[in-house]
Amino acid sequence: VLVIHATALVLLDSALPQLRDPEYGRRAAALRHRIAEHPGRPLVLVVGSSRTCMGLNPTAWEGVRPNGPDRADPLLFNMGLVGGGPIIELMALRRAHADGFRPDVVVFEFWPPFLREDGPFHEPARIDHNRLFKGDVPLVRSYFSDPAATEAQMRYDRLHPLYETRHRLLAQLAPRWQPWSRRMDLAWGGLDGWGWLPGVDEYPPKPVDRAARLAHCEPIYRGQFADYSVHPLADRALREAVGLARDKGAKVALAYLPESTEFRSWMTPEAERRAQEYLATLRRDLNVPVIDARLWMDDGYLVDGFHLSRQGSAEFTRRFGPAVAAAFPELGGRP
């Protein structure tokens, strides 16, 4: 039994990290293949939330990129994680560096709702302790509200690796055995080889279905915009992530992904003012370009007001690739 547990621990933490955190691990494995297939192209790692996961479809960029002889096109890869605000973005970047990836550009998603960290909006509460690696401990100590308790839980997880990860393992080995209401693989089961998570396959939109999604989301986000402010924890994590990317030699940009007319109407004037002032502060303090794609897409492509449909992701990415190239005209390929 001890040998079985020890073997499981090695697999979960080292040999097959996608077993512990398949959402990140599967993307990391896919990224290695894409880099091997496209040597010399400058790597652009895009990190963010489910909006990034479903919105950035690099295959669409591959179909239209210039592929000129005098300049290597950016190699876009989607390293988003569902629920990701600045802290999870920092976690993803730290993991990518620990796994040996050295992006030429890192694009961080900027989204005001995930810049709140107070009360129910505390981002670490969205991170399941079972998906944390030993290398995540510094992040836990810096940003979690009770790091000692989280570390204790991580140690317990490693003493009982099969039991504590049984649901996640089952979701990967036999997902159909899980009832739909308890499926865990929605964030990774459909990932393609470029890190894209296909969203709702709906365009043109079905008015009744789209209206129902908007009605479900509206009270949630109106609540997040009430008494809105950018939390110091989110600001610290975002600035640390930008600094880390630059320390490792990458250029950095921020991206504000598309929102529908309805979603923007849920944002109070005060929340809008504070978010725009904060974005301007980041642009000035950090000297970063901002790819403002907030108004790029017709409402019909946004199935719930803020997530792109599959068709919308393709249209968006065909425009996003050139925007990245324009933001970094000096970007060249590796020798």
What positions do the PLM features span?
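Membrane/wall-proximal cationic-aromatic binding patches
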Residues: I4-L75, M91-R95
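Loop/turn elements at helix/coil->beta-strand transitions in domains of secreted/extracellular proteins
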Residues: R41-L43, A72-P74, F101-V105, K248-A253, ...
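Membrane-embedded segments
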Residues: V47, R51-Y143
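Soluble non-cytosolic domains of exported or imported proteins
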Residues: R51, G55, G83-I87, F101, ...
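Solvent-exposed, polar/charged alpha-helical surfaces in well-ordered, non-transmembrane soluble domains
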Residues: T59, G63, M91-R94, R236-G243, ...
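Secreted/periplasmic serine-hydrolase-like ester/acetyl group-modifying domain
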Residues: E123-K248
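Extended hydrophobic/aromatic segments used for targeting, binding, or gating
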Residues: V230-F306
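Histidine-centered active-site loop/cap adjacent to the catalytic His
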Residues: D304-P335
